[in-house]
Amino acid sequence: MTNYAIILAAGKGTRMTSDLPKVLHKVSGLTMLEHGFRSGKAISPEKSVTVIGHKSKMVRGGLADQSAFVHQTEQLGTGHAVMMAETQLEGLEGHTLVIAGDTPLITGESLKSLIDFHVNHKNVATILTATAQDSFGYGRIVRNKNGEVIKIVEQKDANEYEQQLKEINTGTYVFDNKRLFEALKCITTNNAQGEYYLTDVVAIFRANKEKVGAYILRDFNESLGVNDRVALATAETVMRQRITQKHMVNGVTFHNPETVYIESDVEIAPDVLIEGNVTLKGRTHIGSGTVLTNGTYIVDSEIGQGSIITNSMIESSVLAAGVTVGPYAHLRPGTTLDREVHIGNFVEVKGSHIGEKTKAGHLTYIGNAQVGSSVNVGAGTITVNYDGQNKYETVIGDHAFIGSNSTLIAPLEIGDHALTAAGSTISKTVPIDSIAIGRSRQVTKEGYAKRLAHHPSRSK
């Protein structure tokens, strides 16, 4: 069995009120177009064709080289859009899935069931349908007394009886590929909207006594077509629930799953504990046994097993096992932390590698640095890495001790087991086993404070 897929992505999406094409709006980290394309891969299509139109270059970039593309210059209806794909699929034997690019909730499992149903029943066309409590606005499935599908009627063309029908067209179909394009040559624009309806091919098939069927979705949410921001928010809510439920089934504990945002490509190992208001985005991986406390935000990062991240932000970073971060820490892109590193409250790290068991507990900035293992970085330490034009590197050896309130002016190297005195400004190399002191000598003037205006004795 050879399968093909057509994704309809040419529309502007006026009701979105956006400069961004509708299909490029995101749901749980992926564009609606990407969601549809990924779901369509469940049928293993030999060829996928995406129909583009409005801002076609931008939409094309959303799938890059994963699909063939055809251009619909004028948006003259769904039937006209599918006609554009004939140049790619004409004359091919097999079954063609047609899916709208604005239905992000449709699952691969449902599409696989749809095409299996189509093949097993030897249909020339199979419609994916759903039962709606309120069917207003949807195309209605019209059946005869024997329960056979005889046509699909759009809302504007439906009579009073048809408007009462609850079975609706989801806009997803499977067709015999050759018969699809033959039937499309017979449809007209003789309807309320003056468009070429793809749904009109159903009546054509029936007139030729060809078999048409319908596969009914179990979950109505999958049928959601996103046409405005309200529907986009609904899709986001449903997708978020799906994602958290998937992770819970796989052994992840959530204290308050309704408040957690996890994108589609995030991977979480079993026995992770996630508190409320946690955000996980992009290609993030969380290792087993890790704890993410309230307010943590992680994007495109790898967190090693058994780590504890407390109310902190982590971006494009790699953390080994047993790391502790926070509260209120910020790991910026390019940060690598080895095993059992501790990054404490109000510490910022950027573009740096920090060796195992090193600690930076408080109020510190480490940028463009190579820090060895078992280093103690005292509170208030700053790596001065930027001169207004270029960034420079600081290198700190193993077992070094950086005193509190040290200012390290790069480029700089501090050797193994070296020490900088608290309050020092260090701008020259500190050799192995050395102590560097870079501060003014303290001068104490006894009794002098009594001469100052703030002293209590001055108010008498």
Curated annotation (Swiss-Prot):
Binding site for acetyl-CoA: A379, N385, Y386, S404, A422, R439
Entry cofactors: Mg(2+)
GO terms classed as biological process: cell morphogenesis; cell wall organization; lipid A biosynthetic process; peptidoglycan biosynthetic process; regulation of cell shape; UDP-N-acetylglucosamine biosynthetic process
GO cellular component terms given for this protein: cytoplasm; membrane
SUPFAM superfamilies given in the database record: Nucleotide-diphospho-sugar transferases, Trimeric LpxA-like enzymes
Binding, Mg(2+): D102, N227
Region annotation Pyrophosphorylase: where it falls in the sequence: 1-229
Active site feature: H362
Function, as annotated: Catalyzes the last two sequential reactions in the de novo biosynthetic pathway for UDP-N-acetylglucosamine (UDP-GlcNAc). The C-terminal domain catalyzes the transfer of acetyl group from acetyl coenzyme A to glucosamine-1-phosphate (GlcN-1-P) to produce N-acetylglucosamine-1-phosphate (GlcNAc-1-P), which is converted into UDP-GlcNAc by the transfer of uridine 5-monophosphate (from uridine 5-triphosphate), a reaction catalyzed by the N-terminal domain.
Name of the protein: Bifunctional protein GlmU
Organism, as annotated: Streptococcus pyogenes serotype M49 (strain NZ131)
GN (gene name): glmU
